[in-house]
Amino acid sequence: MKKHFKNLIKNSYFFLLITLIYLPLLIVVLVSLNGSSSRGNIVLDFGNVLNPNPDSKSAYLRLGETDFATPLINSIIIGVITVLVSVPIAVISAFALLRTRNALKKTIFGITNFSLATPDIITAISLVLLFANTWLSFNQQLGFFTIITSHISFSVPYALILIYPKIQKLNPNLILASQDLGYSPLKTFFHITLPYLMPSIFSAVLVVFATSFDDYVITSLVQGSVKTIATELYSFRKGIKAWAIAFGSILILISVLGVCLITLQKYLREKRKEIIKIRQWKNS
C-alpha cells in the first residue's frame, strides 16, 4: 500500500510537470485556429475554435499578409553565422582545455559559468559600451556585425559546456591506434574524433541557434536598424498579433516533428543493432 502510494505521488508529479511544460504550447496551437480581429490581433476565445466567425480572418492568412519575412530571414542569417563561428571556437577551446593544467582549467570554467549566470541586461550594457568605444568610434553603425558579435560572445560558453564533457570521455587509444595505422592528425580528426563528437556538436548547434534566434534583450540594444523576429514580436504594444501566434504554432509543430524523427531514428538504430546481434548469435 505504501509503495503504491509512493508510485502514485511520483506519477502525479511527473504528469503535473509534463502538463506545465506542454499545456502552454498546446494552447498556442489551439488559439492559432481562432480568427483575428480587424486590427490583426488574435481572438482569445476558445469557443471560436469550434465555431469560427466566418467574417474573421484566419491567423494563418494574416501570416501570409504580414511583412515578417525580412525579420525572419535576418534571424536565420544571424543564427546560422553565430553557429558557424561559435561551435568551431567551442570545439577548439575544448581540446585546448583538455591539455590545460587543472588550476587554469578551473579558472576558465569559472569565467564561463560566470558569463552564463550574468543577467542579459548586464551583458547587453557591457556590449553597448564596448561597441561605443570601438566599432562606433570608427563611424560605423550598429547592425548585423554588432548583433552577430554579441551573439557569438554569449553562445560560445553554451557550446563549450555541451562539447567538453564528450571530449573528456574520448579514448586516447583510438587516436594512438589511428596514428599507428598511418593516419595524419587531420585525417584522424575527420574520421575518428569528429564522428565521436557529432552528437554533442549537434546539440550545441541546436542550443546556439535557438538561443540566438529568440534573443531579445541583448539584440534590442545592439541591433541598430536591423529587425529580427524576437524584436518584432516584442514590439507589440496593443494585443497579440494573429500572425505571431500562427508563426509560433508552426515552430512548435516543426519542433515536435523533429523530436519524433530523432526518436524514431534512435529506435530504428537500436532495433538494427539487436537484429545484427541475433544474426551473429545464430551464425555462431
From Swiss-Prot:
InterPro entries from the UniProt entry: Bact_Polyamine_Transport, MetI-like, MetI-like_sf
Source organism of this protein record: Mycoplasma genitalium (strain ATCC 33530 / DSM 19775 / NCTC 10195 / G37)
Coiled-coil portions: none
Residue intervals passing through the bilayer: 13-33, 76-96, 116-136, 143-163, 189-209, 242-262
Role description: Required for the activity of the bacterial transport system of putrescine and spermidine.
Annotated gene: potC
Entry protein name: Spermidine/putrescine transport system permease protein PotC homolog
Pfam hit, one: BPD_transp_1
Localization per Swiss-Prot or TrEMBL: Cell membrane
GO cellular component, as recorded: plasma membrane
